[in-house]
């Protein structure tokens, strides 16, 4: 399985008309934070591959659509997504708000990707498990910044979903 991972800045090798020629055989794309959502949208449109993203601590204009943020008009999807420990990608169309840009938000969720699988030595197809963690260490009380204890608590909440997957 070949995964294209992008983060932090717009890459001219990707953000051009030859992007598919530069990366012809990728299976999956991970957008690992601090990217403008228009760039994520471009990546989804050009590559037409399963794309997953998290937020970093910058470019947070659309963060409110995926999380409950006091003082904003958060989407109903934010409430249901933040309370779940395990999300199967076959229900994401009903979960996502209109601002998804074609990519699936993986922040603080375990995603069992039935459409993206890999084969082990025994040739059995196994769904890929992807767990996303958004944000950074708290340094100015901005959005998507967490203390060490806050992050530990968020990570511990992901454990039941990971254990459930292990039992399958």
Show which residues each predicted segment covers.
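Short, acidic/turn-prone active-site loops that include or flank metal/cofactor-
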Residues: 34-35, 54-61
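Hydrophobic/aromatic beta-strand patches that form the interior of the parallel beta-sheet core
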Residues: 30, 52-54, 106, 131
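Conserved catalytic scaffold of divalent metal-dependent phosphoesterases
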Residues: 5-13, 59, 66-168
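Short secondary-structure transition/capping segments
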Residues: 43, 64-66
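N-terminal active-site segment of His-dependent metallophosphoesterases
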Residues: 1-46, 164
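A short helix->loop->beta-strand "cap" motif at the edges of active sites that frequently abuts
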Residues: 47-51
């Amino acid at each position: 399985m070949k995964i294209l991972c992008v983060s932090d800045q717009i890459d001219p090798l990707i953000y051009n008309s030859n992007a598919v020629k530069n990366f012809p055989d990728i299976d999956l794309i991970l957008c690992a934070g601090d990217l403008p959502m228009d760039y994520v949208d471009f990546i989804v449109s050009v590559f037409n591959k399963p794309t997953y993203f998290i937020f970093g601590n910058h470019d947070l204009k659309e963060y409110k659509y995926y999380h409950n943020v006091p003082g904003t008009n958060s989407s109903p999807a934010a409430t249901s997504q933040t309370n779940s420990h395990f999300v199967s990608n076959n229900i994401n169309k009903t979960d996502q708000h209109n601002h998804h840009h074609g990519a699936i938000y993986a922040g603080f969720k375990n995603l069992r990707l039935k459409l993206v699988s890999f084969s082990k030595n025994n040739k059995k197809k196994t769904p890929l498990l992807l767990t996303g963690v958004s944000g950074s260490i708290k340094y100015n009380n901005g959005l998507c910044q967490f203390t060490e204890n806050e992050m530990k608590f968020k990570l511990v909440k992901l454990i039941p979903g990971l254990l459930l997957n292990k039992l399958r």
